[in-house]
Amino acid sequence: MTENAYRNPLDIVTEGRTLPEGYDSWGIKSIGFDGKTRKGFEWPAPGNETQYYELLDHNSSCPRQIGDGLCVGTTWKGMASGGFRAFCLLLVAYRSIEARSDEVGKLRVPQAFVVARLDGERLARESFRGANLHGADLHGADLHGADLHGADLHG
């Protein structure tokens, strides 16, 4: 891999980790500091599964109503689509055979296992050095104090 090659942050976060029994794929979820997402859904603590939801008959990555599954990201862009910033993150596992998706980077699942709660800012500082930001939309980003030495900001 070249120095500036893109590497999905989810691959970095899951490196060396083992999926929980019965699960075959990793996902990432941004949540509020209170552990909740849209419409007040409260995610369980690490080491626990969410309730199982019957998915409605559509392939959308997003639930159409409460009880129509959970939206999980497989990329940072997909994770951020729920409107929560990457401060408080959950590393989750899901069963790929149950996932529905019509967008790259995010999907809808009937159940997820919460593996870990992550500090998004700390993770970025410690693990994402040398990130290739080619084409990144940084509109509105607070870059005060950011060390962008060597960052590829072309685009």
What name fits each language-model region?
Residues 1-155:
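Short, glycine-biased loop/turn motifs at secondary-structure junctions and
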